[in-house]
From Swiss-Prot:
It is found in: Cytoplasm. Mg(2+) binds at T44, E113. Keywords: ATP-binding, Cytoplasm, Magnesium, Metal-binding, Nucleotide-binding, tRNA processing. GO terms for biological process: tRNA threonylcarbamoyladenosine modification. Pfam families: TsaE (PF02367). Required for the formation of a threonylcarbamoyl group on adenosine at position 37 (t(6)A37) in tRNAs that read codons beginning with adenine. Is involved in the transfer of the threonylcarbamoyl moiety of threonylcarbamoyl-AMP (TC-AMP) to the N6 group of A37, together with TsaD and TsaB. TsaE seems to play an indirect role in the t(6)A biosynthesis pathway, possibly in regulating the core enzymatic function of TsaD. SUPFAM superfamilies: P-loop containing nucleoside triphosphate hydrolases. This is tRNA threonylcarbamoyladenosine biosynthesis protein TsaE. Belongs to the TsaE family. One of its GO terms (cellular component) is cytoplasm. Disulfide bonds: none annotated.
Length: 157
């Protein structure tokens, strides 16, 4: 793996949540997270941790049927998009860029589940691939045009 990729293991969903909370403290305003993994891999659990780390006290739920959930009560907004039920053309009409361009919505952290349905990837993002591994999850981080050192995002040993 090169300097733009890293892998590590989280032993359970609680650790995934804890890492999400840690991540929220480190990510800069305007971060786009592309979440990949099978159904039930822990994508929403990670976003729940991100929300807690941002100080969001309300319930954070999967936007599978609402497509987008917006949480604005934390230290910065959190936008959670789930594109699972949409095709590329439907995603294009959703205009997901509005959540990370900072023009129509205040900048925050945008987490996108099923990003392969995006008609075009953003120019800068952090991709997080979650894979089942027993009770835990293997995590692969990949950065695209990312200024931050990925080692800073690793969970504590």
């Amino acid at each position: 793996m090169n300097e733009n990729s890293m892998e590590f293991f989280l032993p359970d969903l609680n650790a995934t949540d804890q890492w999400g909370q840690q991540l929220a403290q480190q990510l800069p305003l305007g971060t786009i997270i592309l979440l990949q993994g099978d159904l039930g891999a822990g994508k929403t659990s990670l976003v729940q941790g991100l929300g807690r780390g941002l100080g969001i006290t309300g319930e954070i739920v999967s936007p599978t049927f609402t497509i987008v959930n917006e949480y604005r009560e934390g230290k910065m907004p959190l936008y959670h998009l789930d594109l699972y039920r949409l095709n590329t053309l439907e995603v294009e009409y959703l205009y997901p860029e509005q959540y990370w361009q900072g023009e129509d919505f205040p900048l925050g952290i945008t987490a996108v589940e099923w990003p392969e349905r995006l008609p075009q990837l953003p120019s800068q993002y952090l991709q997080i691939q979650l894979c089942h591994q027993g009770e835990g999850r293997s995590i692969a981080l990949t950065a695209q045009d990312w200024a931050m050192d990925l080692k800073e995002l690793l969970p504590p040993s």
